[in-house]
Design a protein with these regions (language model features):
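Metal-associated gating/positioning segment near the N- to mid-region
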Residues: 50-117
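Short low-complexity, flexible loop/linker segments enriched in glycine and/or proline
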Residues: 45, 117-118, 122-127
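Metal-coordinating catalytic core of metallo-dependent amide/deamination hydrolases
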Residues: 124-146
Length: 146
């Protein structure tokens, strides 16, 4: 169990704490409250003077798609490229993903560029992970459109 103590906590439910604690178990938040008694076996982070809030979802991003000279997210071979899949243009080794995590962005919906009228299919990815396959949350071309 990980306990983050003494942070200024903002929750998605609107319940905020000037000085609050967060309990995390197996990578999931299990409690947010004014005070959590931390047992000796718990890992504890003192977040005094720091903020804690839900991760930000960037609903329109080109992160990792314009990393080099390729400009793979901007497919401009014709006016409409509806079958262009942003998944195959994303480079997760760029520093963009590290910057996103530091900024609090935990999920990005990566879209093709605006080089044409219909750019293609988006892909939702986590900011953390070791490979695009691990980071991908939703890729319509691979998982259907549900």
């Amino acid at each position: 169990m990980l306990v983050i103590k003494n942070a200024r906590v903002f929750t998605a439910a609107g319940r905020n704490y000037d000085k609050g604690d967060i309990a995390v178990e197996n990578g999931k938040i299990v409690a947010v409250t004014e005070s959590i008694e931390a047992k000796d076996s718990y890992d504890v982070i003192d977040a005094s003077g720091l903020f804690a809030m839900p991760g930000i979802v960037d609903a329109h991003s080109h992160i990792g798609g314009f990393a080099g000279y390729d400009q793979d997210l901007n497919e401009m071979t014709c006016n409409a490229t509806p079958s262009m899949e942003s998944f195959y243009a994303i480079d997760v080794t760029t520093k963009d993903f590290q910057r996103a995590k530091r900024a609090g962005i935990t999920t990005s919906v990566i879209a093709p560029g605006s080089g044409n009228v219909v750019g293609g299919l988006v892909c939702a990815v986590k900011s953390a992970g070791s490979s695009l396959e691990d980071m991908c949350i939703k890729n319509p071309s691979m998982h259907g459109s549900d």
